[in-house]
Amino acid sequence: GHGQDDFVRILAGVAHAYKGFTQVSINHGNDYFSIKSLEEAQKHEIAFVSGDRKREGILPNLSIKENLAISMYGNHSKVPGVRFIEWNAINDIVDWEVERLAIKTGPIENLITSLSGGNQQKVMLGRAFATHPKILVLLDPARGIDLQTKRDLYKQLRDFADAGYSVIYMSSELEEFIGFCSRVIVFRN
């Protein structure tokens, strides 16, 4: 590769740069922040979705609902400093993401491994959306999913971008950029 996977992982805070640093410009270049960890990326409302859902996405021993909700861990606690999952507060968000992303789940308490690969990937996208990110970083998210699920994915990402948020999408498939991206960066050498 040419470093594009590493770049995306560093930007999302899931990997560390061996040297140098990563800065994200905001407010039309008038301000910036650095990313040194996943916690810093999350603090700045950056979410990450990998195309390798088996290694970097699904938690196979958890239910569909738990896989969607895990990103909200602590975000809905009514007691400051207490980090636990409040299912009453989270159920509505989980139901909304399942409906919005048209995830074909069956009973939501089933293990996530009961879903097709495309629906597992939709759960990963829903998990990211549930954190209300301003920047969504995706690393080859359409890898190994069917054509209709790809179309659904692209529509959700376009809607997210049209709402004023940023999508950073890494792919090695040129066709994925046509009609989808406003800017393309090519990594070479």
Summary of predicted features, one role per range:
Residues 183:
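Short, glycine/charged-rich "phosphate-handling" switch motifs in NTP-dependent
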Residues 125:
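Hydrophobic anchor residue at the start of the ABC signature
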Residues 130-134:
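A short, proline-enriched helix->beta-strand linker immediately N-terminal to the Walker B motif
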Residues 177-179:
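A short, surface-exposed alpha-helical micro-motif characterized by mixed small hydrophobic
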Residues 8-115:
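Conserved P-loop NTPase catalytic core
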Residues 171-172:
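H-loop/switch region of ABC-family ATPase nucleotide-binding domains
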Residues 139, 146:
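ABC-family nucleotide-binding domains
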